[in-house]
Regions:
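Conserved alpha/beta core of the MobA/IspD/sugar-nucleotide pyrophosphorylase nucleotidyltransferase superfamily
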Residues: 65-125
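Conserved core of the sugar-phosphate nucleotidyltransferase
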Residues: 2-90
Length: 125
């Protein structure tokens, strides 16, 4: 979900930070990856090996803050694409927005959730 003015704000933020290669909209994730697992044969292991003792059992408030890129807006310098042959570069500037504006649409159910979120913030009226 992209509120009015977000594109202009993102371009402005990138222009104000000449050492940044790009800007990406992010938000706090609904699930912390420090509490996620991956399958390793018959067993599971933590997705991230952080060195934090039993990180999967720690309160999320004590874990490092992470952000989820939600695809709402990416602003990229042409020099990043041409010179670095990258869509993000090495220095990505965050633009943190409310997670209520995150919409990951993969199926009809997630589309309905996104439509409800749009209505709740006044989009489409």
């Amino acid at each position: 979900l992209r509120p009015g003015g977000l594109i202009d704000e993102g371009i402005s933020k990138l222009r104000q930070c000449p050492d940044a290669d790009s800007l990406r909209v992010v938000c706090s994730p609904f699930n912390n990856p420090y509490k996620m697992w991956r399958l390793a044969g018959r067993f599971m292991e933590p997705l991230i090996d952080s060195g934090i003792p039993e990180q999967v059992n720690q309160p999320r408030q004590t874990l490092p803050q992470v952000y989820w890129q939600i695809g709402t807006l990416d602003v990229i310098r042409s020099s990043t694409i041409i010179d670095k042959q990258s869509l993000i570069g090495d220095r990505v500037l965050p633009m943190i927005i409310d997670s209520g504006l995150a919409a990951d649409i993969d199926d009809e159910k997630s589309l309905a959730v996104a439509e409800d979120a749009c209505r709740s913030v006044g989009f489409g009226e």
